[in-house]
């Protein structure tokens, strides 16, 4: 009998995950289906029971359930306990094991381009949901230091504490304090939602050049003002869809124990734009 997979969250109708995973199933002739399943914020427990009833084989978790879902897991992978959030779950006869593929998904496009992360100075804009996985990724790859710039300094300070706990030198500033300092960093990452509504770049790229890597995790629109401004300075740019694809590939491999058909998944993802 075919296996069923899902993505849960609210809102969920804009999710690109069903397209990406369905394309992978077609490419490899797997008897599987993937559905988007809306579970409102305060109905997670009932939603999970519903998934168990249909003998779900695995599911992705998105906003607003990534932290709350931790309570319902029977087992957790180390990526999950480190980041404190879950985005991929395997269900083995109703026994739920959680993983977090955001860190690997984030690092994947950097590795594909052979970008040297070790000893790099990083500027991270934003301290929200994805930021913790990004900090964990830079710690794992032995970045030299990370400056966390956020609208409110408190959230940035919390993330600095987390970074130091996992042996990554870190400091916090507000986004306004970035000023003309972008040129002092090897890698600059936007993990805020600025760009989703076509807003202009939150920082100046004065002095940035082709040696700088600029990465935006916002994936719609694909070409944010942040990336356009970086491109004008000849920086190496990484698109948000690449992280989305990286984490989907990792989730596929966890569920199926085989290499994911990267190109088929990429084509399906880009077709959704």
Curated annotation (Swiss-Prot):
Chain sites annotated for binding NADP(+): 78, 126-130, 150-155, 217, 240
Function of the molecule: Involved in the biosynthesis of the chorismate, which leads to the biosynthesis of aromatic amino acids. Catalyzes the reversible NADPH linked reduction of 3-dehydroshikimate (DHSA) to yield shikimate (SA).
Keywords: Amino-acid biosynthesis, Aromatic amino acid biosynthesis, NADP, Oxidoreductase
Enzyme Commission identifier(s): 1.1.1.25
Assembly mode: Homodimer.
Organismal lineage: Archaea, Nitrososphaerota, Nitrososphaeria, Nitrosopumilales, Nitrosopumilaceae
GO biological process: one example: aromatic amino acid family biosynthetic process
Name of protein: Shikimate dehydrogenase (NADP(+))
Gene it is expressed from: aroE
Protein origin, superkingdom: Archaea
HAMAP family (alphabetical): Shikimate_DH_AroE
Pfam families linked: SDH_C, Shikimate_DH, Shikimate_dh_N
CDD domains on file: NAD_bind_Shikimate_DH
